[in-house]
Amino acid sequence: LQAWPQAVQELTLLTHSMGGLLARSACQQAAQAGHAWPAQLKRLVFMGTPHHGAPLERVGNWVNTLLDKQTVTRPFAKIGQIRSAGITDLRYGNVLEADWQHADRFESAPDARQVLPLPAGVSCYAVAATTVTHGVGPLASVRHALSHKMVGDGLVPLESALGLHEDPRRTLAFAPENQWIAHGMNHLELLKRPEVSLQLVAWLQGAT
């Protein structure tokens, strides 16, 4: 921001997937370090961000643990441990260094993250997606319930993308009008579908 050719009055961050976790981490660390830019941050948009993790990483970690218990399958467990720190952060949605410090990131462990709310004084928006279309019929409500809990956008469940958690302390306080669910859309399609762009424009224009 200091190198920008003119003075920056306000900053908006548009993030996708793990980029949202990085943005939350950066906001917290910058505030603790006394940096100036968090005061310029006015809007923060999350698209498909796994605020509370992604089941696929947890399943992968469980499989890796099973493989490591048997001598004959242990070499395959070593392959599973090639996963990057960023990928293992997806297990629960780690944001702060303290969330993984002094822990073996490949070991199965309960969610021990520090509670971190959304940055204060910033308008935050959450876009979540589900691969299930609106649909009709007697099983429509069942399909939607399963999608909310399990499928989501194919990587991130709806509840995780919306910051919802069974522990109220961990639920992120997105205003209802700042949440939007895209139907019939997967994780990567959030980056290119016109419906998403229209919603972002509506939010950001309304916030100016």
Predicted regions and their residues:
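Short, well-ordered amphipathic alpha-helices
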Residues: 1, 23-32
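Conserved acidic catalytic loop of the alpha/beta-hydrolase fold
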Residues: 1-11
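Gly/Ala-rich beta-loop-alpha elbow adjacent to hydrolase catalytic centers
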Residues: 14-19, 23
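Helical cap/lid subdomain of alpha/beta-hydrolase-fold lipid enzymes
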Residues: 28-208
